[in-house]
Structures are given as C-alpha cells and as structure tokens.
Regions:
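Amphipathic alpha-helical repeat scaffolds
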Residues: 50-54
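Proline/glycine-enriched tight loop/beta-turn segments at coil->beta junctions
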Residues: 40-46
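Structural microenvironment flanking redox-active thiols in thiol-disulfide oxidoreductases
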Residues: 57-111
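Sec-dependent N-terminal signal peptides
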Residues: 4-14
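Conserved hydrophobic packing residues within short motifs/helices of P-loop NTPase cores
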Residues: 46-49, 79
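N-terminal "domain-start" segment that seeds a small globular fold
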Residues: 18-39
Length: 111
C-alpha cells in the first residue's frame, strides 16, 4: 500500500510541474528566428497587447513600456503582438522592431 501511495503521489507531483496547455506554445520573437515558449511566463501576470505602429493609439507604446518597467520585477510581463489586419503596421518585421525600439524604447517581448 505504501508503495502504491508513493507512486500515485509522484504521478501527481509531476503533473503539478507541467506547464498549462494554454501557455505551452512556441512563439517566434519579432524579427528573429528565435522562439520562446510561453511557459517561461507561467507564474507571471501576462498582458497580451495587439499593437500596430501606424495606428491612432501608437502613442500607447510609451505607457506600455513604463508599465512594463515599473512592474516587471513583480512577475509582470507585456507580450506585444503586431497586427497588420487593418493595414496600420509596417510590412516588414525589421521595420516594426526598429520603430518600437527607436521611437518608444520598447523592450518588452514582441512576437
């Protein structure tokens, strides 16, 4: 019986360390061939933001960056996801990455 309980508890303890299926996703980093598994942020508060560099709300990059800088040490992360759905984003990822870092100093993860 003791052996059975040890095996069962080991089974459940391994599952406790598994990443949530929702986060267990590889995302390609903007303007890079590198990928990042979102399980890295499993214990973080995550804000996913759909962004566009030529949108009327582009100025919000500055506020997002300030928010990220203020709370990132407290397990908070912003994940930026550029969208070309409304033709308000640069056509190349290189241009998007350069714009975000040059104009707004964005250093939160972008995919």
């Amino acid at each position: 019986m003791k052996k059975f309980l040890v095996i069962v508890s080991l089974f459940f303890s391994f599952n406790a360390f598994a990443c949530n299926d929702l986060l267990d996703t590889e995302m390609r980093i903007l303007d890079s061939s590198e990928t990042l598994n979102l399980c890295e942020y499993e214990n973080n508060v995550i804000l996913v933001v759909n962004v566009a560099s030529r949108c009327g709300y582009t100025y919000q990059y500055a506020s997002l960056q300030k928010l990220y800088e203020r709370y990132r040490e407290n397990d908070f992360v912003i994940l930026g996801v550029p969208s070309r759905d409304f033709m308000q984003e640069y056509s190349s990822e290189e241009d998007v990455a350069e714009f975000c870092s040059t104009e707004y100093g964005v250093n939160f993860p972008m995919f």
